[in-house]
């Protein structure tokens, strides 16, 4: 994925254009072995394989860890790599990529939300129902979704992203 390109014809001349060069830094990028037995790209590919064949979910899984390993994100914690806040950086990168690839704004908004939220879901499951309900109410009033049905579909997709992501770890 990271080294794939397509040919584009411009003024009667063909040129090679990289499709997703933003993935390049994920190749061989180590993760904390307490949670991951794969490098970031391998984890991403396993997560995609775990997910359903839904375009928004697949894109969210391709892009969910893009922020990992970047200079302003990667830290060493107790001698192990950690990427606090990578989901926000990944979401910003996802928005740029999907916009560049000319996906519709509504689709971009959904995938960006899935990427941005993929780390929030797990801790809330552990802290209890009240915390989860408070978060859902907060998201419902954020203006992110114009209809209740959109919100319900987004949450269902987020569950799928979470399950696919967790299935690609050994946490």
Question: Which residues are covered by each model-predicted region?
Answer:
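Acidic/His-rich, divalent-metal-binding segments that scaffold phosphate/diphosphate chemistry
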Residues: 1-84
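Divalent metal-dependent catalytic cores for phosphoryl transfer on phosphate-bearing substrates
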Residues: 49-170
């Amino acid at each position: 994925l990271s080294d794939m390109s397509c040919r584009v014809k411009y003024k009667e001349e063909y040129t090679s254009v990289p499709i997703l060069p933003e993935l390049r830094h994920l190749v061989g990028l180590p993760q904390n072995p307490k949670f991951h037995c794969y490098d970031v790209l391998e984890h991403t590919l396993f997560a995609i394989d775990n997910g359903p064949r839904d375009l928004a979910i697949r894109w969210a899984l391709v892009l969910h860890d893009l922020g990992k390993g970047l200079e302003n994100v990667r830290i060493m914690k107790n001698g192990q790599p950690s990427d606090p806040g990578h989901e926000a950086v990944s979401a910003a990168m996802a928005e740029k990529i999907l916009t560049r690839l000319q996906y519709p704004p509504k689709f971009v908004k959904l995938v960006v939300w899935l990427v941005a939220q993929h780390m929030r879901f797990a801790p809330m499951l552990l802290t209890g129902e009240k915390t989860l309900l408070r978060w859902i109410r907060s998201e419902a009033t954020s203006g992110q979704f114009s209809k209740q049905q959109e919100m319900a579909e987004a949450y269902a997709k987020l569950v799928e992203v979470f399950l696919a992501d967790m299935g690609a770890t050994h946490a």
